[in-house]
Amino acid sequence: NQSKGLSPADFPNWLLTQFGSVDEVRKAVESGAVVITPTVLDGWGPVAPPFHYIVYDKTGASLVIEPVGGKLKVHDNALGTLTNSPSFDWHMTNLRNYIALNPRDVPPLKIDGDTFKALG
């Protein structure tokens, strides 16, 4: 719906001028009150760069908004961070791969007579 369309560069201004909290932003974006429309770039034609946006309010609450599958997806952002592609939820899952990292050597683990040493 072009009547709800904003360029990727205009989207942050719309957020800042229309809403007072991340809850208001969430409701508007999830209801489809806005869509990101392609911008014509010389030599590229109409494109909508997959910008990712971070939104904070005065309470410290934060959201990430990113294009996924042609729609804007909203994520709660407890870490207060922003990522590029792949999607924010992928990065949150990937972060769990590093939770158990430790700067100290891990002692070998013995299981049924076999000893397993940590890599690295």
Spell out what each predicted region is.
Residues 1-2, 36-39:
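A contiguous strand-loop segment
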Residues 8-33:
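Alpha/propeptide regions of enzymes that mature by internal proteolysis
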Residues 46, 52-58:
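Short, structured surface segments that line ligand/substrate-binding pockets
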Residues 40-46:
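Short, glycine/acidic-rich hinge or "gate" loops at secondary-structure transitions
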Residues 1-14, 56-120:
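C-terminal, well-structured catalytic/ligand-binding subdomain of enzymes
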